[in-house]
């Protein structure tokens, strides 16, 4: 199934081609542009048009790449152990799955929106390179490797607040100035 835009989203031929190439070639798509030009809406409409679940990861200045994988709550586990809680025996009870974990373990291919990736610190994109390339990561606490059942269609957005690292950009299929390409 090809993306051609929707009744709620008029896509240019170039942008539709970029979305379809990202899907076919299984490469992340980066859409850059000014706030309010429809970058996030693109991911929503792509998911709707392709009948795929949308998983949204909204990035803030304090977001760490590891949060997209998982977070281990050692403090709660320590407290539970002091209170004699039976849950403490299974460390998995203290793992909060991140958006990449959810996307990788979904039973069907999903659209993963990594929204405003340029808001995070400069190392954030590079910290995701291996996971996005291999489509797997290791959870040290449980000793398991989380592998993607289906490679998600990854759409990243950037407001051009700061430059993204060259090593990261070289792994992307396409970048676009959304202000020129998007019509909403």
What spans do the regions from the language model cover?
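AAA+ P-loop NTPase catalytic core and its hallmark functional loops
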Residues: 1-176
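Single conserved hydrophobic/aromatic residue that forms the stacking wall/gate
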Residues: 174-184
């Amino acid at each position: 199934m090809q993306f051609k835009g929707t009744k709620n989203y008029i896509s240019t031929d170039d942008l539709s081609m970029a979305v379809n190439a990202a899907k076919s070639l299984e490469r992340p798509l980066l859409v850059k542009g000014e706030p309010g030009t429809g970058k996030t809406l693109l991911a929503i409409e792509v998911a709707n048009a392709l009948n795929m679940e949308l998983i949204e990861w909204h990035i803030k200045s304090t977001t760490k790449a590891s949060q997209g994988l998982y977070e281990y709550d050692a403090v709660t586990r320590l407290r539970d152990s002091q209170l004699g809680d039976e849950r403490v025996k299974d460390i998995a009870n203290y793992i909060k799955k991140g958006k990449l974990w959810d996307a990788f373990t979904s039973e069907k291919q999903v659209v993963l929106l990594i929204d405003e990736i340029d808001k995070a610190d400069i190392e954030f994109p590079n910290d995701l390179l291996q996971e996005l390339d291999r489509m797997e990561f290791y959870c040290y606490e449980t000793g398991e490797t989380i592998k993607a059942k289906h490679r998600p269609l990854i759409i990243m957005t950037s407001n051009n607040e700061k430059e993204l690292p060259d090593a990261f950009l070289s792994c992307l299929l396409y970048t676009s100035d959304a202000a020129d390409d998007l019509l909403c």
